[in-house]
Every structure is written in structure tokens, then in C-alpha cells.
Amino acid sequence: MAVQACALSLRLGLWMSLLLPVLPGAGARAAGARWSGEGTTPHLQSIFLGRCAEYTTLLSLEPGNKNCTAIWEAFKVVLDKDPCSVLPSDYDLFINLSRHAIPRDKSLFWENNHLLVMSYAENTRRLMPLCDVLYGKVGDFLSWCRQENASGLDYQSCPTAEDCENNAVDAYWKSASMQYSRDSSGVINVMLNGSEPKGAYPTKGFFADFEIPYLQKDKITRIEIWVMHEVGGPHVESCGEGSVKILEDRLEALGFQHSCINDYPPVKFLMCVDHSTHPDCAMNSASASMWRESPALHAIGDISLIISLLVALASSSQA
């Protein structure tokens, strides 16, 4: 996955606007800011605890087994550390307290398509990407760090990988990514962006460096790669090309059974809901061929999605 992240829709934009009030100077790098990243998210503790409470009450697979206050206390230890001296291991207790089982066949890894992943996963109803497990949910889209030479939080800016390797947010996602990989099992889904100019599979990215190495081969049936191309966007890479071929070769060398499909239809249909008249969204023989070649497409959950999306597309075209 990329650093922060699980590009939802209008609902996400509304949710974020309600959840992340903008303070003067927040959201853009202020003049004279020490670091290149956004500063600590206003009301960090309240947002963290609110997300935790919502998850454990409404979504958790293990209701009643998580203490959100204890999880916050374990997390906030890093807020007392130098902003460039935070290690993944500093989140160990936080991960241990917030960790829970990931349903078999429900893991979804990704690069460069955070919001599409969130939209398709549908709040754990369809799949469960890292940003939909508890230890990923509480920090998603947030930023945090201590001031460089003081004890308070830095609301002006926080370091990113451009500033220093051991920054608080990257360390968090490294730790979460490693645990997510260890806990994933069955069929592993990977969504890549085939329209990304730098390539669909970053060979130096979170998926490459902190997720693939921690997959437990004895727990995994196969890995399915979905290379999605943006509606109206370029086809920079597809299955068997460029960095995708590098990924396929790596999985082969590691002994994983794997397959790759371009523009996995259920996800493509979702992308086309807002672009129903675009040529990229026309149902054609190529789409039908991809459908026939992928047995997984006949799962009940995907069929229900496709039916609902086809209805939406038909309604849009008649409007």
C-alpha cells in the first residue's frame, strides 16, 4: 500500500469535512514550516477514540474485546518521541492491543488507488483492506508528530520520508502493514493502478517492502492481481508488462500461485458508475472475455454488486 491510505466518493468527502475541522494554517504547508508534511491533525485524540469506539461497537469481529482508552495510551507513546526517531517497534503494544482476525479470502492489498479500494471494500462488507482493520482505521488519513525541540504536538508540519526515514506516520504504517500481511490468509487480492505514470507496482513501496516479505506462504492459497486503469486515463502498464511483470516474477520466485487480470470487472463497473457514457465503460467482447477467464467473478457478492451497478448505469443512461 501507499503511505497513508485507504478516493472514496462524495460520502468520504463529507465524512472527512465533518471529522477533520480545518484550523487556520492547517492543510497546506505554512510559510517557514520545519517539515514537508502536514502537521498533527487537529483533535487527534478525539478522532482516534471516536473511530475506535465506532469500530468496536459496530464493525469489530470481536465485540467487547477492545479497550479504546488502552489502545490510545499505547499509541500516544510515539507523541513523546523525537519526530525523526520513531521506529515501527514503538507501535508494538498498540498493534497487540488493537489486532483482530482478518476473515479468510478478505484481504485486499493495493498501491496508488486508496480511495477506490475503500469504495470497493465497502466498510468491510466486501473485503477488508488495511484501512478497514482496527489498527489501520484509527490512523487513516491522519497525521501526528511531536515538536522537534519541545514536548507539545506540532500542528504546523510533520516529517515525511523526504525529511527523515524514522518519522511517526511512516513507522505506523510499516508496523501496521507487516501485521496485516502476517494475519492475511486464503486468496490474497492486490489492486494496482495501471494508469500510474511511475508504474503500477512500486518496487520500493509499502507493498513491496513491508507486506510481501511478511506474507505467510503456508496460509495463502493464491494471489490475484487486479490492474485497474482509470476511466479515460492512460494504460501505462497492464498484466505482464513493466513493473507488473516484475511483481509477477517476484511472486513466482517466492513460490506463490498467482494470476493477473486487467480491469477486474466488478471494480471497473464501480468506477464507471460516475462515467456511464464514457467509451471505457462500454460493455464489449473484451469485458466478456475477461469475465469468462476469471472464475472468482462468479462469487455471490460480486454478482450482487454487478447487478446493482448495471441498474445504476441503466438509470444514468436514461436520465
Curated annotation (Swiss-Prot):
It comes from the Eukaryota. Residues 1-33 form the signal peptide. Keywords: Cell membrane, Disulfide bond, Glycoprotein, GPI-anchor, Hydrolase, Lipoprotein, Membrane, NAD, Signal, Transferase. GO terms for biological process: positive regulation of B cell proliferation; positive regulation of cell population proliferation; regulation of actin cytoskeleton organization; regulation of calcium-mediated signaling; regulation of cell-matrix adhesion; regulation of inflammatory response; regulation of neutrophil chemotaxis. Its EC number is 3.2.2.6. Coiled coil: none annotated. It is found in: Cell membrane. Homodimer. PANTHER family: ADP-RIBOSYL CYCLASE, ADP-RIBOSYL CYCLASE_CYCLIC ADP-RIBOSE HYDROLASE 2. Belongs to the ADP-ribosyl cyclase family. This is ADP-ribosyl cyclase/cyclic ADP-ribose hydrolase 2.
